[in-house]
From Swiss-Prot:
<feature type="glycosylation site" description="N-linked (GlcNAc...) asparagine">
    <location>
        <position position="83"/>
    </location>
</feature>
<feature type="glycosylation site" description="N-linked (GlcNAc...) asparagine">
    <location>
        <position position="43"/>
    </location>
</feature>
<feature type="transmembrane region" description="Helical">
    <location>
        <begin position="97"/>
        <end position="117"/>
    </location>
</feature>
<dbReference type="InterPro" id="IPR045014">
    <property type="entry name" value="TM41A/B"/>
</dbReference>
<dbReference type="GO" id="GO:0000045">
    <property type="term" value="P:autophagosome assembly"/>
</dbReference>
<feature type="transmembrane region" description="Helical">
    <location>
        <begin position="246"/>
        <end position="266"/>
    </location>
</feature>
<keyword id="KW-0325">Glycoprotein</keyword>
<feature type="transmembrane region" description="Helical">
    <location>
        <begin position="192"/>
        <end position="214"/>
    </location>
</feature>
<keyword id="KW-1133">Transmembrane helix</keyword>
<dbReference type="InterPro" id="IPR032816">
    <property type="entry name" value="VTT_dom"/>
</dbReference>
<feature type="transmembrane region" description="Helical">
    <location>
        <begin position="269"/>
        <end position="289"/>
    </location>
</feature>
<feature type="region of interest" description="Disordered">
    <location>
        <begin position="47"/>
        <end position="79"/>
    </location>
</feature>
<comment type="similarity">
    <text>Belongs to the TMEM41 family.</text>
</comment>
<keyword id="KW-0472">Membrane</keyword>
<protein>
    <recommendedName>
        <fullName>Transmembrane protein 41 homolog</fullName>
    </recommendedName>
</protein>
<dbReference type="GO" id="GO:0005789">
    <property type="term" value="C:endoplasmic reticulum membrane"/>
</dbReference>
<keyword id="KW-0812">Transmembrane</keyword>
Amino acid sequence: MEIDNQNINNINNNNIHNNINNNNINKRNIENNINNINNINNNISMKNKNNNIDNKKNSNNNNNNNNNNNNKNSISNNNNNNNKSFGLYSLEQPAPLPLWLLVIVFGVSISVIVFLFLNFPSLSPQHKQLIRLPKNFKDVKLLSDILSQYTDDNYFIVITTFGVIYTFLQAFSIPGSVFLSFLSGGLFGLKVGFPLVCFVATLGATFSYLISYYIGRNLVRKLFPDKLKLFSDSLSQKRDNLLNYIVFLRITPFLPNWFINLASPLLDVPIHTFAIGTFIGIMPATFLAVKAGIQIQNIQNPSDIFDLKSILTMAALALLSILPTLIQKKLKVN
């Protein structure tokens, strides 16, 4: 019996040891499982971190790309704006034509004038010596006296030659057209001379505009950078009433007409606005000059033409031309 009890105790002890071992194994298994789970979680966490880092990198790359694109677009826009500020619809501007074409155009124009003179009515040797472009008021009076003797019988050739020469002077910015304005009054009277001068002066200015745009715009930029900048700044403030501003500039002496002709195509002034503004703006001074030309033999000094009354009238017209701009600016402030 004692032996059996001992055996039983031994068996029980073995079982207990086995259970303890099993428990230890289970604990180890549990710990291993926990470690595995932790490892898996760590791996997942690392992957997430890596993914976040990749996402951040991608995001930064995208932001950098976007910034680069924005910078490129900004640079492109700035370039376009810079081009536009010194060019008519710069994005569509063709390359300027070679300057030697200007020499050809000038030569052709001279040839036309020479042809007209060759077909001019026969003049006496004394009169031929006096036919030249007037340089002062005395020359205008002398030329008016000579040509008036031929105008009635040779009206078409005289008026054609007058128009071509006036247009030529305006197109190539050559001084002397103001004296031809006086001459037109003596030769053609107010009814013909006034609209004729307005038309040929506008036509010549438009030719100057086109020559500057297609051939000479780089040369104009090079010769007058400061004046162009000032004119550009002035125009940018008057864009809403550009026509009125061109009229104002033509009436007033703030900018010479030849510079307005050359600079306007470089500063986004549309050609139709330029032509209409020029035609309207030169009317007051042209009217006074042509009217004075009718009585040119009685005028001793050009200053007699532009008396105080005439100056005040032109000042009033200049104010009227820019009045819409002033009103609009006042409304915006309010």
